[in-house]
Amino acid sequence: MKNVRDFGAVGDGITKDTAAVQQAIDQGGTVYFPAGIYLCGSLYLHSHTTLELENGAVILGSPDPEDYNQPDFCPQNSVCLPEKAFGAHLIIALEVNHVVIRGGKIDGNRAAFFDPSLYSRDDFPGWRPSQMLYFCESSNILLENVEMVNSPYWTCFLHGCSDITIRSVNIRNQRGVWNGDGLDIDCCRRVVVSDCIIDSSDDSIAIRASGKDRLLHADGICEDIAVTNCVLRSGQAGVRLGVGNGLIRHCTFSNLVIRDGKFGICMLSTYYPELFPAGAEGAGISDILFSNLHVNAQIPIDISSNWADKPLKTSRKEICGITLQNIRGYGCRTSILQGNQDFNLRDLTFSDISLEITGGEDILNPNHPSVPICYLRPCAFYIAYTADVLFRNCRIRWKDESERWQQAIGTENNRDLVFTDCRFALPRAGNGN
């Protein structure tokens, strides 16, 4: 075991400890951090390396851009100019295996780079790092009992990795931070996330199939993902699936509490192609199971072929083989199932779903500043351009709802849409389903 203090690390939160910590890491094996605040720029992990942080040990991101990697340090890395993220990372694991980070705290020092109350993202004139933890084309990764806080962008990004365990991790990002995701799992295989608490300003957990053209060894498939026993508080989606042009398949999500976001469960094949043209083809999403969830979000469920108010003529990728069961949800805007005109949103089962709908004062408001009109329809659930969809033993109730609501279910151009043993109450102003 190598103690970073034996290599000259001070741990006072003022002295830059990057060189000393990197020297300890370069020795390999277990690197021990006693209590203290270790101010660091980019740290590069090697295979068979463990970072063991004692209680009270903090790796704190340097406020100086020159202490971080260059954006072209590896061909897989990227800069996202629309999101003002410049490709720098605090901890990097590139093409390595058997890496462990355990205990302590990793702090991205977001406040050193920007104050979201002073700028919008589009108006921000400065520089900020990208993902705080960056794992790329690596395998056998364990993240355990570690806090990750104050990331200036996404917190933890796993791209093209395999055999990953994320257990008892606590992620906290300040509300209002642009793109402050929790976990982004992209083109990865065999991932288990369990017993985590994530409080994120953007998506808490995002399953993606993006950037496959940048990967050197992995493909664009994200599969065999299991997420269980987590509490997620989100500014956007509790769980998001989609983004990119690869495939997402064979995923389970169970025993989750999702709170406070715009979306509880969000699946979206094509996402903002005008901003991200590489993903215009869309991600295929199949064989997905959600079970035993408590969801409290503005829009509890959104499964859509594209990010648009209206269906497109064709889809290049399918969303199919989706099951949601044993879910209790609370919302104030319209949940959506919307495919494109080729009915490539198909084979969906909703079983034992209970939704309670409140509010609705902005329903049918085309001037709402931030929510597309498709989420402001006068029904609790809107279903359009789908095929082979079953609702079984589902219930919709109302509480303190606006008179703008008209009905529980709205449908348009569906094939084989079946409801069995369902109870859909009318809102106060409703005139039929």
Task: State what each model feature region is.
Residues 1-433:
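Extracellular/periplasmic carbohydrate-active domains that bind, remodel
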